[in-house]
Design a protein with these regions (language model features):
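Glycine-rich beta-alpha loop elements in corrinoid/cobalamin-binding modules
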Residues: 2, 9, 23, 32-33, ...
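Hydrophobic/aromatic residues located in beta-strands of well-ordered beta-sheets
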Residues: 3, 33, 103, 150, ...
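Catalytic cores of alpha/beta
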Residues: 114-120, 312, 374-390
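Short N-terminal binding/cap micro-motifs at the start of the first secondary-structure element
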Residues: 12-19
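Radical SAM [4Fe-4S] cluster-binding motif and immediate context
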Residues: 176, 183-364, 371, 386
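Structural recognition of alpha->loop->beta junctions
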Residues: 116-135, 317-322, 387-399
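Radical SAM enzyme core and accessory elements
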Residues: 2-6, 19, 25-32, 54-56, ...
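Flexible glycine/acidic-rich beta-alpha junction loops that bind and position SAM and/or redox cofactors
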Residues: 42, 114, 222, 333, ...
Length: 548
């Protein structure tokens, strides 16, 4: 059976898609992967001016995409809610060209909004973890047998919808058995006016630079109402448990990628809750990474409640050079509204621990802040600004304008309150130039004296209060803010946030290699772990380095 797997998003990171694509290629060798990118972050102008939003794909491009997909026997689509409309249009056009082709829609959107996704011109949607459910579905489809009882799927039969339940979540052993995520194997990318072409080395550089993005763990112990994970937890409460393959598995995955792409000299872990992984597993990971990989890595998705000095220390010793932690708000009332059990005092405690390692060992940490919540009062906004002002420096901020994901707890609560929700396809990085938001850009760049900060606070209002906008001042402070962020990274020769040729040429001329082999070795590092005093640590389980 000829299968085409299709990812639609901003770029080509697609961590989850790469996993299911690799698994599908294992069970069905005649499988190819296709990437349709909106390129909304490809422009420096978009970043500086905040003019993001979902990329526009016109009718001619939709037709060209569909023409390139139509000759498959089965097409599997993957997209988030922000790209649901584009996905739906592609599916519809493929159906016009090939009424008999089997089409399945997976990814985040069908899980969060299955009732919406099933109305597309598809035969099925995947509503849970896809790997082993898809294997069952594909086996039955190839044999011409009834597949409509396969769990983790909904199926359409004429006007009827068959809504099946869920398989148990993958076990650690099952995760260990999966092939490594697909990267550089039978992948194609859409180029406007040319259709799909094999991904060239330049595509990996343009979209990723010298960084490789991956996931080690799945799951999140929190039920934050704004997050799509709440739907995963609603479907199976066990999603609050952190699951992951062995440390050997993730280290060998990265080694496998670096063997084929030697320019990869930084790794980003996009786990939802990396720091919630038990210390013993982190220690095992750290020793393997320090011994066998020896390149810097960044940990995203850090939750304040799980920040511990010993975990930060062991990961820093291994090579962690940056942390990104979710703060979201400094208002206890708003954190409770988000159902996020991270009180401001816990946030302050976490930032103080992280500050012990910055800038001695780390690039300035990034802290996520959510603004423009219509429920916030003026005092809630001030509480957030006060918390950010008091956090130990250096740090940088990642500022989001609240966008509500449909069918989440937050969406339901907002609707109860009669709040008119903005469309999800408005980017959460489009930050209105209100005084509160401008102050965040200022705080991410410079710590003003207290008297000046107090004066500026007097101009702050809740986002729903009519107030003047300052687009020119906002642009100035955005420019300074991003300039400071670039400087912070260049101090550590960290190009992980700079996809494109700049980071590649830094690798080619030997700058990154010189820095990592000569300079970092001489920089102070925490003491290595003393495994002799940790007899209860589980032994490393050896696995094959190549998983096809």
């Amino acid at each position: 059976m000829r299968i085409k797997m299709v990812s639609l998003e901003d770029g080509t990171i697609s961590c989850g898609f790469r996993k299911i694509a690799a698994f599908t290629a294992r069970i069905n060798p005649d499988t190819e992967s296709y990437y349709i990118t909106t390129k909304r972050y490809a422009s420096l102008r978009n970043v500086l001016f905040g003019s993001h939003g979902i990329g526009v794909v016109d009718a001619d491009a939709i037709d060209e995409i569909a023409q390139g997909l139509k000759d498959a026997d089965l097409i599997g689509f993957s997209s988030m809610t922000g790209y649901a409309d584009i996905t739906r249009r592609v599916i519809h056009r493929v159906r016009e060209l090939r009424p008999d082709v089997l089409m399945v829609w997976g990814g985040i959107h069908p899980i969060i909004e299955p009732e919406n996704a099933i109305t597309a011109d598809v035969d099925a949607i995947c509503t849970g973890e896809g790997e082993f459910a898809f294997e069952q579905f594909l086996s039955l489809a190839k044999e011409g047998r009834d597949y409509t009882k396969v769990e983790n799927f909904w199926f359409k039969r004429g006007e009827d919808v068959i809504r099946n339940g869920f398989l148990p979540l993958m076990t650690t052993a099952q995760m260990e058995s999966l092939p490594f995520p697909q990267y550089g194997e039978k992948e194609k990318i859409y180029r406007e006016g040319k259709g799909f072409e094999p991904m060239a080395f330049a595509d990996y550089v343009v979209h990723g630079g010298q960084d490789y993005s991956t996931l080690w763990s799945i799951g999140c112990p929190f039920r934050c109402s704004y997050c799509g994970n709440t739907k995963f937890i609603e479907n199976d409460p066990n999603y609050t448990k952190i699951r992951h393959p062995s440390a050997r598995y993730i280290v060998d995955e990265v080694k496998s990628v670096r063997q084929r792409f030697p320019h990869i000299s930084h790794v980003s872990f996009h786990d939802d809750s990396f720091m919630a992984i038990p210390y013993k597993q982190l220690e095992e990971f750290a020793e393997l990474w320090h011994e066998e990989v020896r390149v810097p890595f960044t940990v995203y998705g850090v939750i304040p409640n799980y920040v511990r000095r010993d975990k930060i220390e062991i990961l820093t010793w291994a090579g962690m050079n940056r942390i990104r932690m979710g703060v979201q708000s400094g208002s206890e009332a708003i954190l409770e509204f988000y159902q996020r059990p991270t009180p401001p005092e816990k946030i302050r405690e976490a930032t103080e621990i992280i500050a012990e390692f910055t800038p001695k060992y780390h690039v300035a940490p990034s802290y996520d802040i959510i603004m423009d919540n219509p429920v916030e009062t003026r005092q809630d906004v001030i509480d957030t600004l006060e918390l950010v002002y008091a956090m130990p420096r250096p740090y940088t901020l990642i500022i989001f304008s609240l966008k509500v994901i449909p069918n989440t707890g937050l969406a339901k609560e907002m609707l109860k309150r009669g709040i008119d929700l903005e469309q999800i396809d408005a980017s959460y990085l489009q930050i209105p130039p209100r005084m509160a938001n401008i102050l965040l850009y200022l705080l991410g760049t410079w710590c003003p004296p207290r008297w000046l900060f107090d004066q500026l606070l007097k101009r702050v209002e809740a986002s729903t209060t009519p107030q003047p906008l300052y687009p020119r001042i906002g642009l100035l402070f955005r420019f300074l803010f991003f300039g400071k962020k670039v400087i912070n990274h260049l101090k550590f020769m960290d190009f992980s946030l700079m996809p494109g040729w700049i980071s590649y040429y830094a690798y080619r001329i030997g700058l990154i290699d010189f820095w990592q082999r000569r300079v970092i070795k001489r920089m102070p590092r925490p003491e290595p772990p003393k495994r002799a005093f940790s007899p209860d640590v589980a032994p490393v389980i050896a696995t094959d380095a190549v998983r096809h």
